[in-house]
Amino acid sequence: MPQHICELTYDLIQRGVLTFDKSANDDKVVTFHDSCNVARASRMGDSPGGQFEIPRAIIRACVNRFHDMAPETIQESTFCCGGGGGLLTDDLVELRVKGALPRMQALQQVVEEHGVNYMAAICAICKSQFTKVLPYYKHPMDMIGSVHGLVSNAIVLGAKQ
């Protein structure tokens, strides 16, 4: 049965196959963006809500500092990145910037409260969108990254025999 890469990674973590050095990500204070297509139209794992819990569990396995955005802005109540639905074109950048406003406001809150400097996502559209719009909101474009980028930074190769 096909599975999302997060499901495979989570399974390997649960079985102790992957080992991490969380300190490899100590330069990052991380939050997570629930991509709207994944949040509303996907399922991960064996139980409802896996699409929310699995990416966060992977992040927590790889970083020492993780902070969710406000509860009313995540999971089933997540905000669209503003770039989906065919909007991911430079011709529509003004609309994309406006569409990202609710997420940018939620992000700004955790930046101010917790010093967040990295927003992880699992959707390629979201990552492309945020790379473009983050500078409009006075954040560096490299503030957005992938969950598996964190995995890659922290993985300890050759730890298991």
Q: Which residues does each predicted region cover?
A:
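Iron-sulfur cluster-binding electron-transfer modules in prokaryotic oxidoreductases
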Residues: 1-161
